Amino acid sequence: MAIDFSKYIASVKDFPNKGIVFRDITPILQDGELYRIATHELAEYAKSRKADVIVGPEARGFIVGCPVATELGLGFVPARKPHKLPREVERASYDLEYGSNSLEMHKDAIKPGQRVVLCDDLMATAGTLRASKELIENLGGKLVGAAFYIELPDLKGREKLPDVDIYSLVQYHGA
């Protein structure tokens, strides 16, 4: 029986800024069985893409990606916000739905030729995904897929990266 994960995602209006509807995944995380099932679904997707490693952007990508990597017995690579990693890094900038930022990965985090699946909580404008893809490719890896709890199709993230296979548990159309 398929689970309708949208029943467990809280919608918070005007957070973090006026006009934004924040999709809060913490109700899923608070339910151990639901979290396990969501993780398993993303892990099955990553397995189908023959991933060698999982990348998760800071911060909720850690929460989503680490258990996927663990379930599959794969390594996990954090894509961190600037100045959080102690060794030499590669950096890429991106725009958010409500601002801009950069992501960094250690220069030795992705091995040449590795097949990478990115896991995160939400894809909106695909800015984080685009920056992560740039980092992965600059380090010699290949982004073979991206898995999200939530996708906001109206923001056309898929259209911005048509060469990336994208999987999501829930899609929210409109506000």
Curated annotation (Swiss-Prot):
PROSITE patterns named among the record's database cross-references: PUR_PYR_PR_TRANSFER (PS00103)
Localization, UniProt: Cytoplasm
InterPro entries attached to this UniProt entry: Ade_phspho_trans, PRibTrfase_dom, PRTase-like, UPRTase/APRTase
Any Pfam family: Pribosyltran
Gene3D superfamilies attached to this UniProt entry: 3.40.50.2020
Enzyme class, UniProt record, top EC level: transferase
Catalytic activity: AMP + diphosphate = 5-phospho-alpha-D-ribose 1-diphosphate + adenine
GO biological process: adenine salvage; AMP salvage; purine ribonucleoside salvage
An annotated Gene Ontology molecular function: adenine phosphoribosyltransferase activity
Entry GO terms, CC: cytoplasm
This protein's pathway: Purine metabolism; AMP biosynthesis via salvage pathway; AMP from adenine: step 1/1
Record's keyword annotation contains Transferase: yes
Keyword line: Cytoplasm, Glycosyltransferase, Purine salvage, Transferase
EC number(s) reported in the record: 2.4.2.7
Keyword Magnesium: no
Function: Catalyzes a salvage reaction resulting in the formation of AMP, that is energically less costly than de novo synthesis.
NCBIfam families listed in its UniProt record: apt (TIGR01090), PRK02304.1-2 (NF002633), PRK02304.1-3 (NF002634), PRK02304.1-5 (NF002636)
Family: Belongs to the purine/pyrimidine phosphoribosyltransferase family.
Subunit details: Homodimer.
Cited PANTHER family: ADENINE PHOSPHORIBOSYLTRANSFERASE
Identification of the protein by name: Adenine phosphoribosyltransferase
Source species: Lactobacillus helveticus (strain DPC 4571)
Gene that specifies this protein: apt
